[in-house]
Amino acid sequence: MAAAAAAAAAAGAAGGRGSGPGRRRHLVPGAGGEAGEGAPGGAGDYGNGLESEELEPEELLLEPEPEPEPEEEPPRPRAPPGAPGPGPGSGAPGNQEEEEESGLVEGDPGDGAIEDPELEAIKARVREMEEEAEKLKELQNEVEKQMNMSPPPGNAGPVIMSIEEKMEADARSIYVGNVDYGATAEELEAHFHGCGSVNRVTILCDKFSGHPKGFAYIEFSDKESVRTSLALDESLFRGRQIKVIPKRTNRPGISTTDRGFPRARYRARTTNYNSSRSRFYSGFNSRPRGRVYRGRARATSWYSPY
């Protein structure tokens, strides 16, 4: 009887259990077939069933069924930054969120990609500026070379003359002594203008102080003018009696003294008067030491004409 009651209780517990697992179901007297044979017998069977339930609880408790664990999805490969992503609605919402998060994480390299063209543009601009600076330096060097090679317009550069040319020019020149210190080349040219065409007037100056030395040289267009100008020897010029004699040529390597004045190095102020018949000589020596006058125009240059 006890075994039958325990089996009936187990079957009733399995069939009549509610929503909660392991819920006990008490036997009602007379409900079962075997227990309904009699009231006394049924009550006794019920009591024996309770005792069996209390003595053997392990048989009445049902073990809860284990819930199935969700299967983990394999990791999906990430698409490269430039590859087109899946369209809207093609994937699950979870996948879309993951893609959005990955896009946010991978957005930082995109900013660097945007900065790269700007950096390249800055580098290109710096290279252009360096090239322009190099071109400017080259132009400046070319201008300096041209200025050193050719004299500026308006100034007479030194012309190297041969000994024959110097002697020929000296044969058409005269020496004028006792010249007033305030005299100008234009005044001397006007004083000797009647003797012939004057190519150049040179007033010698001291190379340290720059003051006139008191004598000058006048170059004519031809030798005939030299002979005519000798007639003005001991004539008055600015209230002083001047001395007029033919000019002598300095020969290289020979130290000469002309009328008590050393003729080695000195500064000069020169005025050149060009005519259709005359030939212009910028100087007798190559070293510039003086102020040169071309015609009536006045320019500055340094050279030693005699």
Swiss-Prot record:
The modification Asymmetric dimethylarginine is found at R238, R259, R263, R265, R267, R269, R277, R279, R287, R289, R291, R294, R296, R298. One of its GO terms (molecular function) is identical protein binding. Its main location: nucleus. Residues 1-12 have a biased composition (Low complexity). The keyword Transcription regulation does not apply. Keywords: Acetylation, Coiled coil, Cytoplasm, Methylation, mRNA processing, Nucleus, Phosphoprotein, RNA-binding. Residues 77-87 have a biased composition (Pro residues). Residues 1-115 are annotated as: Disordered. Ubiquitous. Residues 30-47 have a biased composition (Gly residues). GO terms for biological process: cellular response to lipopolysaccharide; MAPK cascade; mRNA processing; poly(A)+ mRNA export from nucleus; positive regulation of polynucleotide adenylyltransferase activity. It is found in: Nucleus; Cytoplasm; Nucleus speckle. Changing A133S: No defects in the stimulation of PAPOLA. Residues 51-72 have a biased composition (Acidic residues). The modification Phosphoserine is found at S19, S52, S150, S235. The modification Omega-N-methylarginine is found at R17, R238, R259, R263. The modification N-acetylalanine is found at A2. Arginine dimethylation is asymmetric and involves PRMT1 and PRMT3. It does not influence the RNA binding properties. Residues 119-147 are annotated as: Stimulates PAPOLA. Residues 172-249 form the RRM domain. The RRM domain is essential for specific adenine bases recognition in the poly(A) tail but not sufficient for poly(A) binding. Involved in the 3'-end formation of mRNA precursors (pre-mRNA) by the addition of a poly(A) tail of 200-250 nt to the upstream cleavage product. Stimulates poly(A) polymerase (PAPOLA) conferring processivity on the poly(A) tail elongation reaction and also controls the poly(A) tail length. Increases the affinity of poly(A) polymerase for RNA. Is also present at various stages of mRNA metabolism including nucleocytoplasmic trafficking and nonsense-mediated decay (NMD) of mRNA. Monomer and homooligomer. Binds RNA as a monomer and oligomerizes when bound to poly(A). Associates in a ternary complex with CPSF4 and NS/NS1 and interaction with NS/NS1, blocks nuclear export of host cell mRNAs. Associates in a single complex with SKIP and MYOD1 and interacts with SKIP in differentiated myocytes. Interacts with NUDT21/CPSF5. Identified in a IGF2BP1-dependent mRNP granule complex containing untranslated mRNAs. Interacts with PAPOLA, but only in presence of oligo(A) RNA. Interacts with transportin. May interact with SETX. This is Polyadenylate-binding protein 2. It comes from Bos taurus. The lineage of its organism: Eukaryota, Metazoa, Chordata, Craniata, Vertebrata. The gene is PABPN1.
